[in-house]
Amino acid sequence: MTTTSKIINDGEGEDVKGNKNINKKSLIDENRLDEKKDLLSDKVESKTHCSVKRMAVLTSGGDSSGMNPAIRAFARQVMLKGAKVFAVREGYNGLVNDSIVPLNWGSVAGIISRGGTIIGTARSAEFRTREGRKRAVFNLVKNRIDNLLVIGGDGSLTGANLLRTEWCSLLEELVKDGKLTLDVMEHFPILSIAGIVGSIDNDMCGTDLTVGADTATKRILEAIDSILSTAVSHQRSFVIEVMGRNCGWLALASGVATGADYILIPESPPDDGWEQTMADNLERGRLSGRRCSLVIVSEGAIDRQGKPITSAYVRQFLEDKGHDARITILGHVQRGGTPTFLDRYIATRMGIEAANYFYDSTIEQLKQPVLIGMSGMDTIRSPLMECVQKTQSIASLIKERRFNEVVDVRGGMFKEFYEIFIACSNLHRRKVESKGMGVLILHSGGPSPGMNPCVRAFTRLGIDHGYTMYGCFNGFGGLALGEIEQLHWMTVNGWSVMGGAELGTNRSIPNDSNIEAIIATLERFKINAILMFGGFNGYLGIAKLYEYREKYQQLKRISIIGAPGTIANNVPGTNISIGSDTSLNNTLDALDKIKQSAVASRRLFVVEVMGAHCGYLAAMSSLTSGAERSYIMERGITLNTLTKDLEMFVERFKREHRIGLIIKSELASNTYSTHFIYSLFKEEGKHLFDVRESILGHLQQGGTPSAIDRIFSTRLMNHYYQFLENDLKEHGHLQMNGCIGFIDGGIHYTPMQEMIEEMSDKFRRPRSQWWMDLVETSQNISVFPLDDPSSTNFEGCNSNLSEQDRPIKKSDISSPTSYSQKTFDPNVNPQFTL
């Protein structure tokens, strides 16, 4: 490499061509540092009052949808903390070739809804050599970066840890080579590493879900849902091949979510003679009335001898057995596309947590690399290499054919879903004797996507446990009228992919006029347990039934349980409710389209979403869409708030912003309605921007259930029967009353009295809501603080956030080419790899 002068960017300028705004002290020789010059003078001087940290983010390995939201959240949270943030372009190649560019607030604007990674990714052969890693260390030190966030798979994270462990020795070599001064080792003693797993395979230990896995599953379900219609028409058998390498999560999740007949995954190879077992299972389905068959093959599927099982082999075997079989290999369609709500959410939360880790940790803590993961809806930190080594051990276990251990290493959720699939696909029934107990399911409240998959799992798992299954039509009103039918195995065939509610739902609840009719119906059908799957009205209904136990002794012999099935996520005993994920995906789809229309004409949109008195949908859609403001009842709306927000939008549009987005919950305020807010902003901003209002309405309740709503409703039903079995074993009869739901990554039971105390009847929501702090988080990372007159979100060294970090005009920026120019347009965010 030729000797050239380059710039260490210390925040005083971002021009790579040596213009006058660059601090000349930051010029160094690429091959040699002047020993008399202190490279770190600015940093050492500032340590006495406020050390300015410098951090970088890179994406490596295969891309996944959700990487961009993670980059956005990390970069902006770092800026709010007072640090300087850089992007390493093209993965580890960028470290080796010094393709490290500074980011400002506008650099990551508008990327939250984009798939892939705007900073590029690559697999680097040079980085695998020690010489390549030495160049990477030099380039990091040259830019005074000693905190690195790596977003990628286990290989990328292993590479980051290797760089960390070699850091000191590589610095010593650079000093010996004369490229760095000795005092550099004193000021850069360690390289701090944080990792976020970006992988569609969901193959990493230490997190419930990896960034990109939910979007990939969505792509698979969209394809399979489309294929099923043609398969049913022609009575065909389809073999679907999905990605996954050594991990069968995508095949397993899509198998559970679509009601597939058979899956082949590397973690649990089928027994010898599996071909005939598969054919027999497909034949049983056809004899039961199914018009199509579905086999899902993970690309890494093997048999017990370690021999690969290909989709072509499966298809040929089925054809030999007389099936009209077809293959669909989904390929890279699984990897791309707009991120789902969940991928945007977890990526945003993990990006913020990574920034907090670099700032909140002690020196000793920073010496140990961490993996930022998710447990339920919250972030967790785990030892990076412990998670990587555990993950990589799975490949060895598969190679050694220790298959009994593989599923256990994958984790409890993987094992649970595999057992659920085996039961629901009729591959292995318990064949237990009938318990002679009737279990009834009904819906109450508004319709929610996920109700039909729930009923399917409820029915099949219940039959598998030996219960007699019943379905009640039209909620508690239907129960009073005796509208009950027994549910059989094939009654719910195909329900896993259906939106709406086949059993029907309404908002009626038990009362003095119908309670005796309800009890008569329960006695006539010999019901021992009631599961209400629905919304807040349903919880009021089961609370009312529980109250009637004092007057009607018959109810004391019946278990009454509520399960969350509402888009509003406003019921007690759970962090999330089934249906809210589908609703948020519908909302984000609409918001993305609205934002595209707004860009063309400098427009501010005021969008109203459902949720009644609960602001969950508004808060979450704001966090994951990049909306500047969200208005919810829990925080209230005042005239002062609206005035400050109006000032903020005026300032933003004055600075050539082309779009603004406000999301309002439908009952956020009785006085300041959606139309009032629209009228106010339209009148005051008419010379700068146009304003439109949009009420999304019932599109939020419809649509095919999302992957998460399908598989989590199934998981919820599996735990419901575990609770029933434990209750039966402990007391000899069913007597549990309360609700079940998702709390802290698990499924928990809440007793009835505790559930009732948690409910706010006035506002029809839980008294305590876990997500409230995220409203402020969303606002903080969406609006440049110097644009926001109400901003109080500066921390620590916030004085370092200046006008230089503000989005600037397009004419001031040059566009990049790979490994060359070190700046890019921070306003329009071009795909760097194009």
From Swiss-Prot:
What residue spans carry the region label Interdomain linker? 427-437
Annotated region described as N-terminal catalytic PFK domain 1, given as residue ranges: 1-426
Q: Which domain of life is it from?
A: Eukaryota
What is the recorded name of this protein? Answer: ATP-dependent 6-phosphofructokinase
The ranges of region (C-terminal regulatory PFK domain 2) come to: 438-834
Give the matching NCBIfam families.
Answer: 6PF1K_euk
Assembly and partners are described as: Homotetramer.
Amino acid composition bias (Polar residues), ranges on this chain: 813-834
What pH-dependence text does the entry carry? Optimum pH is 7.6.
| Cofactor dependence | Mg(2+)
* Enzyme Commission identifier(s): 2.7.1.11
Record the organism: Dictyostelium discoideum (Social amoeba)
Q: Which GO terms describe its biological process?
A: canonical glycolysis; fructose 1,6-bisphosphate metabolic process; fructose 6-phosphate metabolic process; glucose catabolic process; negative regulation of microtubule polymerization
List UniProt keywords, sorted A-Z.
Allosteric enzyme, ATP-binding, Cytoplasm, Glycolysis, Kinase, Magnesium, Metal-binding, Nucleotide-binding, Transferase
Cellular compartments per GO CC: 6-phosphofructokinase complex; cytosol
- Which Pfam families does the UniProt entry name for this protein? PFK (PF00365)
